């Protein structure tokens, strides 16, 4: 009888990535297979997120439900990982006696070892340290699950925004070596992956070591990934405006594999609130980035994050945010009502914005962005869009689902053979959260792949130095 593993994941795409690596790790080294049913599992893992309000209590409520399973099966192993584990490891140990393992985002690679410690009789094995990049060195080879894949290129954040727990739960910025990332993506491409999403808490701060002792910038990494055979689309998340340098913008100008969609969190349009948040930039600097981006890639769509009701936010501050939303014409947003995160500088500020006022501002903001998104979607009516077919439609399994470059889901009637490939569809209807398409042509009619000589690729970024020696600059 095979051993079963159940993982419950809360939070960001980085957590989703980490959970997939936990499953791969325990599957390869200890033979565990995933199950959707906690009642069937031999190991229960909770991968937590500390961004939202009452994150700690949410963890204890879940552990209370799992405790009933452990009461029935004393051999059941329960582990808690992620950012809440990193921040509240001792509290979890003290309050939840049913928990056997507590591990942080940077120590998930030690799971097999920690499980063995529990089996040898040790209680509450805890490791929430920050051993830099060691985590990636000890994970199994990547395994593709469809035509898209997430690849973590760096961890942590060193910006210390006043409201954010990430530097305290995931540590400061640490970048993976560029060769390791390129190898992982090449392996995924061999398995049929066509689109990669590069992950990091502050992904454009990437500074990875190269094989010759140099440093690879994020802009250089994007071009290296674009050169990998089989990779036709590149996305990345999440970025910080102060790291969005001109060399990254230049990649949008000459690298078609980089999609015409960017998620660039701004949090507020008020300079006063941005200063209180310790964001390190003003609203006009953010707009300057967008202006230069749209010069390089005129059709790019922009999404962002907003925090509503930050301590001291006045009606005038909120009006500044709404003005920024209008000026930038955001296409999508992740918007949240502010709630203090324990241990952050902002937690010491008086939460002086009335909750009803916060809710009203949030509704106004979301309504405006929904209107702008629908306007963009209506402009797509009658156009032909190239989409990567990800699988069956969620609402109708007899149809297919794909995604446009600007991150819109399109449902259409198509054949199973199109899954994992690009197709062209005509947009025939528009909905709030998706588009309706009509199949036009498949990948075999697109002439997507062209045979290129090495000299053609090198010529793309060829430069001559002062001595007339030709060099390749990625």
Swiss-Prot record:
Q: Where is the MTTase N-terminal domain?
A: 3-120
Taking every annotated instance into account, which residue ranges of this chain make up the domain Radical SAM core? 143-375
EC class: transferase
Q: Which cofactors are named for this entry?
A: [4Fe-4S] cluster
- Domain TRAM per the UniProt entry, residue ranges: 378-441
Q: Where does [4Fe-4S] cluster 2 bind?
A: 157, 161, 164
Query: Which EC number applies?
Result: 2.8.4.3
According to the UniProt record, one GO cellular component term is: cytosol
The note on cofactor binding and number reads: Binds 2 [4Fe-4S] clusters. One cluster is coordinated with 3 cysteines and an exchangeable S-adenosyl-L-methionine.
Concerning Pfam families, the annotation shows: Radical_SAM (PF04055), TRAM (PF01938), UPF0004 (PF00919)
Q: Does the keyword tRNA processing apply?
A: yes
Name the source's superkingdom.
Bacteria
Q: Which GO BP terms apply?
A: tRNA methylthiolation
Q: Which InterPro entries match?
A: Elp3/MiaA/NifB-like_rSAM (IPR006638), Methylthiotransferase (IPR005839), Methylthiotransferase_CS (IPR020612), Methylthiotransferase_N (IPR013848), Methylthiotransferase_N_sf (IPR038135), MiaB_methiolase (IPR006463), rSAM (IPR007197), rSAM_horseshoe (IPR023404)
Keyword set for this entry?
Answer: 4Fe-4S, Cytoplasm, Iron, Iron-sulfur, Metal-binding, S-adenosyl-L-methionine, Transferase, tRNA processing
A molecular function GO annotation: 4 iron, 4 sulfur cluster binding
Function field: Catalyzes the methylthiolation of N6-(dimethylallyl)adenosine (i(6)A), leading to the formation of 2-methylthio-N6-(dimethylallyl)adenosine (ms(2)i(6)A) at position 37 in tRNAs that read codons beginning with uridine.
Task: Describe its partners and assembly state.
Answer: Monomer.
Q: Which HAMAP family match?
A: tRNA_metthiotr_MiaB
Q: Which family does it belong to?
A: Belongs to the methylthiotransferase family. MiaB subfamily.
* Protein name (database record): tRNA-2-methylthio-N(6)-dimethylallyladenosine synthase
Species whose genome carries this gene: Shewanella oneidensis (strain ATCC 700550 / JCM 31522 / CIP 106686 / LMG 19005 / NCIMB 14063 / MR-1)
- Lineage of this protein's species? Bacteria, Pseudomonadati, Pseudomonadota, Gammaproteobacteria, Alteromonadales
